């Protein structure tokens, strides 16, 4: 069976970092993930997915990723249930994340649009063709000579 999840979205709040009685770090947060299609109003909807992360990755996430951070998460879906204080069974579906990746630069995360440092622009000209040329020969075998094989040489 395969249970793999890959999500890219923005954190809706700072991760809540807690520790178990055996001193294992656990972080919980919600990730807003845009849907690939738009609603009838032309607006893009989002799913809000609960995520749990454990151990060192949880501490790293709590230290680096903040509300609004664009992150990528890999992990698995997990369901669990518990009885609440009213005695009702509550079912929870969440992503147990194994890894995360920050997907924006630090300056974008911190909201710097200007800043004290400005790159020098005098005497700078952008290359005219900055897009790599990935074009290929239409016929990769066009430059070769045909093989001279008789029907008697073929095994079938």
Curated annotation (Swiss-Prot):
One of its GO terms (molecular function) is single-stranded DNA binding. CDD domains: SSB_OBF. Residues 1-104 form the SSB domain. Residues 111-156 are annotated as: Disordered. Keywords: DNA damage, DNA recombination, DNA repair, DNA replication, DNA-binding. HAMAP family: SSB. Homotetramer. Plays an important role in DNA replication, recombination and repair. Binds to ssDNA and to an array of partner proteins to recruit them to their sites of action during DNA metabolism. This is Single-stranded DNA-binding protein. The lineage of its organism: Bacteria, Bacillati, Bacillota, Bacilli, Lactobacillales.
């Amino acid at each position: 069976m395969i249970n793999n999840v890959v999500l890219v979205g923005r954190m809706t709040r700072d991760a809540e970092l807690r520790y178990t009685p055996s001193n294992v770090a656990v972080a919980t947060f919600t990730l807003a993930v845009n849907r690939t299609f738009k609603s009838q109003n032309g607006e893009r909807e989002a799913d809000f997915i609960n995520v749990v992360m454990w151990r060192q990755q949880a501490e790293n996430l709590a230290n680096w990723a903040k509300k609004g951070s664009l992150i990528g998460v890999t992990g698995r879906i997990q369901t669990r249930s518990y009885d609440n204080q009213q005695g009702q069974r509550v079912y929870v579906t969440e992503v147990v994340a194994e890894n995360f990746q920050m997907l924006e630069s630090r300056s974008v995360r911190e909201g710097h649009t200007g800043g004290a440092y400005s790159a020098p622009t005098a005497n700078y000209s952008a290359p005219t063709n900055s897009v790599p040329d990935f074009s290929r020969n239409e016929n990769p075998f066009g430059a070769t000579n045909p093989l001279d094989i008789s029907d008697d040489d073929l095994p079938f």
